[in-house]
Curated annotation (Swiss-Prot):
Pfam families: KH_2, Ribosomal_S3_C
Function: Binds the lower part of the 30S subunit head. Binds mRNA in the 70S ribosome, positioning it for translation.
Record family assignment: Belongs to the universal ribosomal protein uS3 family.
Biased composition (Basic and acidic residues): 233-243
Keyword Oxidoreductase set for record: no
Keywords: Ribonucleoprotein, Ribosomal protein, RNA-binding, rRNA-binding
Any GO CC annotation of this UniProt entry: cytosolic small ribosomal subunit
Chain intervals for the UniProt region annotation (Disordered): 216-243
Sequence intervals crossing the membrane: none
Organism: Prochlorococcus marinus (strain MIT 9215)
MF (Gene Ontology): mRNA binding; rRNA binding; structural constituent of ribosome
All residue ranges annotated as the KH type-2 domain in the record: 39-110
Biological processes annotated in GO: translation
Name this polypeptide is given: Small ribosomal subunit protein uS3
């Protein structure tokens, strides 16, 4: 089951959080859902070169809050914050409400080579430049290992290297426990448009195990602490002392 279901959807509420946080009635829910889709599509098209790995959306009354996780925050912010104002006006135009309050928070991704989306984006860019897919995967594995990930799995499918028959190939380094719910697994998919057709890319990144109570990720090489087993009490047999 863990190999077929979406890794993030399986772990919602355990190690993963929802990308959209808001509540709506049955009448307004479809409208807000379409707004979220339009906002993410607009940001992906306009700021494709900024390396945005995720867009988190939260709503409070009439206020819209966005959190953008990016590898290059300077591309979005611009000079003296001019890019933020341009992005805000673009979002208001996209949703068709110029009076909507939009708060934007740009967060820089600390470990770029440990992010599944950015790794998939890197692989897609290399494949579109006609770099051999085996060499591209090997370079992505090396970058992820230098970033300190515990495990990585990469899958590429399509007409690899221009072959007439499409096929799927994958490689894995380290551990990628898809059945372990407490495992923090980052998952992303991308498409590479080549002259021979579209190549599909899937990336799984295992970053560690999250303890539910402590909400801490277990560091590299460490094992989760187990409760010490209680030793059984020993009783002496004194039934024959008074006989």
């Amino acid at each position: 089951m863990g190999h077929k279901i979406h890794p993030s959807g399986l772990r919602l509420g355990i190690t993963q959080e929802h990308r959209s946080k808001w509540f709506a009635t049955s009448k307004t829910y479809p409208i807000l859902l379409q707004e979220d889709f339009k906002i993410r599509t607009f940001i992906e098209k306009k700021y494709g070169a900024a390396g945005i790995s995720d867009v988190l959306i939260a709503r409070k009354a009439d206020q819209l809050e966005l959190e953008l996780k990016t590898a290059r925050p300077g591309v979005i912010v611009g000079r003296q914050g001019s890019g933020i104002e341009e992005l805000r006006s673009g979002i208001q135009k996209t949703i068709g409400d110029r009076t909507r309050q939009v708060r934007i928070n740009v967060v820089e991704v600390e470990r770029v080579d440990a992010d599944a989306f950015l790794l998939a984006e890197y692989i897609a860019q290399q494949l579109e430049k006609r770099v051999a897919f085996r060499r591209t995967i090997r370079m992505a594995l090396q970058r992820a290992q230098r970033a300190g990930v515990l495990g990585l799995k990469i899958q590429v499918g399509g007409r690899l290297n221009g072959a007439e028959i499409a096929r799927t190939e994958w490689t894995r380094e380290g551990r990628v426990p898809l059945h372990t719910l407490r495992a923090e697994i980052d998952y992303a998919t991308r498409e590479a448009n080549t002259t021979y057709g579209v190549l599909g890319i899937k990336v799984w990144v295992f970053k560690g195990e999250v303890l539910p109570k402590e909400e801490q990720t277990i560091p590299v090489g460490a094992n989760p602490k187990r409760k010490a087993s209680r030793r059984p009490q020993q009783f002496e047999d004194r039934s024959n002392e008074n006989s």
